[in-house]
Regions:
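Non-catalytic helical/linker scaffolds that mediate oligomerization, partner binding
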Residues: 1-172
Length: 172
């Protein structure tokens, strides 16, 4: 509560609620931050997924934390859960962000592997509002390169259409 009060005094407008498992969690946190603040609710558990509709209806935005979620759900189910969460939240006309393990290899390496690049683009294709880098920029050895890489991928995605010519793809 004290941290929230300090944040509000400093003009913080966005607050994230970790491990929201039920709509009551969102209500309790909302009462602490007030209606004027933006509440981003993190989905990180099986209970959170099971209560997603009610949680999303009470939150201003949803953030899928794939790292914490993968501690409770088999890794091979994460991409499908992510797709379902994104579509469900978008259907409610709420922003949905995806975090964790986007460019994880860039903690140590200057360039991501194709699998991570493809994962980022697939996440954008499914309709994610935004992408959240974490360890890549917090403890990574190449934080600027990670941000530049994600920005470039988003820029290319925003310009790409199914009819983009091979020549355009090769020259830009």
């Amino acid at each position: 509560q004290r941290a929230i009060e300090i944040g509000r005094r400093l003009g913080i407008q966005y607050f994230a609620l970790s491990f929201a498992n039920a709509p009551e969690d969102v209500d309790a946190f909302r009462s602490c931050i007030g209606d004027e603040a933006t509440l981003i609710t993190k989905i990180e558990s099986i209970r959170g997924i099971r209560n997603l509709v009610e949680i999303a209806d009470k939150a201003d935005a949803i953030l899928i934390d794939r790292g914490d979620l993968s501690r409770e759900v088999p890794i091979e189910k994460i991409p499908f859960l992510q797709r379902r969460i994104v579509s469900s939240v978008k259907a409610r006309q709420k922003p949905v962000y995806v975090a964790t393990n986007l460019l994880e290899s860039m903690i140590e390496w200057h360039q991501p592997p194709r699998a991570e690049v493809n994962d980022v683009v697939s996440t954008l294709e499914m309709g994610a509002t935004g992408l959240v880098l974490a360890a890549e920029t917090a403890i990574g050895g190449h934080p600027v390169a990670a941000v530049e890489t994600i920005r470039q991928l988003i820029d290319h995605f925003d310009r790409w259409t199914p009819n983009t010519s091979f020549e355009e793809l090769l020259t830009d």
